C-alpha cells in the first residue's frame, strides 16, 4: 500500500531536521543486520558504519527520498535474498540492496500514478456523460 510520501519521512528531510534519531535508527538497522548474517563487529565499528550509511543515504539523490522503513526493508530483504552480496555487510552490499529497494518503490509509485490516472479519466468520462444528460433536460 503506497501512499503519497510525506517529505518529513524522507531521509534528506530527517538528515536536516533530526540527524541524531536518524543515526540511532541506522545503528539499529545495522545491528540487526550484523546479527542476522552472523557478523560481530565492535560497537565502534557499528557506529562508524552507521555514520557512513546515513551519509550515503542523505547525499545520494537516489536514496535521499527513501524513508527509514524503505532502508530497513532493503536490508531485511537483502539478507534474505541469499545471493553472494548478503554474506558480508559493507558499503558496496548495502548500495546493492538500496538500489534494488528503490527500484521496487519507484515501480509501485508508477503503478499507483497510473491507477489514479485511470480513475481520473473514468470519473471525467462519467462526469461528461452526466453533464450531457443535464443539458438535455433543459
Language-model-detected regions and their locations in the chain:
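Charged interaction scaffolds used for protein-protein
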Residues: 1-138
